Amino acid sequence: MEKLIEKIIYASRWLMFPVYIGLSFGFILLTLKFFQQIILVIPKILIMSESGLILIVLSLIDIALVGGLLVMVMFSGYENFISKMEINVDKKKLGWMGTMDVNSIKNKVASSIVAISSVHLLRLFMDADKISNDKIMWCVIIHLTFVLSAFGMACIDKMSKKNYS
């Protein structure tokens, strides 16, 4: 009975597969949004203010950071929880694939969230004259919370690696 339960639990990891497929579709949608932003800015580029262009570029950077986060979560999650990817090492395999454990994924996700939050905050500061001080204050507080959380997770990871060594 115990062996059967273990086989069922082990096989249930495949239930995550549709989640990773869904993230792939999310990545496609994000890519479409990226190109939509570029297409919309092209006709306006010569009449657009410098700060307006910077806001668009920050938006593109934001989309790129979220896309990178999605790719990292999809690939490393699939490899850690479902199955190893059998990719020809000489040609296509990314250098970090197969080397990230759950803790390093968490730290990279936290770092990505801080970077994304930083871009949002910078975009907010570019339009600070149109935004209430309360909203700016709360955005800064939330950003600092992300920073402290990422720092705390990195410290805990470093301490746990020291204790296992």
Curated annotation (Swiss-Prot):
It is found in: Cell membrane. PANTHER family: UPF0114 PROTEIN YQHA. Belongs to the UPF0114 family. Its main location: membrane. It comes from the Bacteria. Keywords: Cell membrane, Membrane, Plasmid, Transmembrane, Transmembrane helix. It holds the Pfam family UPF0114. It is a multi-pass membrane protein. This is UPF0114 protein in repA1-repA2 intergenic region. NCBIfam families: HI0507 (TIGR00645).
